[in-house]
């Protein structure tokens, strides 16, 4: 199975959408003419073009190019150096109410706006958000790739679990079925006095 699906990674499956100049201008927060003027002045690279019939046309801009425009025009949203990154939680005491869908779309929208985003799937063993971003649970993702080692005190921080996605600016901490073990293993570690905090504070 792995031989068959080994190339089924976020990078291998990446399809780069392009935005027309008007759409790019809206995302950047400037006018279309400002983009054209910056390209003519050399502040921005010459746009990618293609020939259709006898007419040469812009093919549109990738999100990486749009983020570069934001940097050039100074419109990219930035967090103050001494500010703590905002944390947004999506939760409900019921299954099937679109928690994952809301989380994924919110993360992608924030990344589209030029922000750096870390989507933490956390304790969900289904791994749906991981799969949405090209990481197939229990094929690409195993217990050691999730938060489980961090929860069990085997890692000092969770940075080892961060993986890139096909969305520029959006990374993910994935999950897989192994997280079914988390509650029983946490309680076992707690009984042994090997947890840095109470289990309910770590979930």
What would you call each of these model-derived segments?
Residues 34:
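Residues in the helix-turn-helix
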Residues 1-23, 27, 37-203:
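P-loop NTP-binding core
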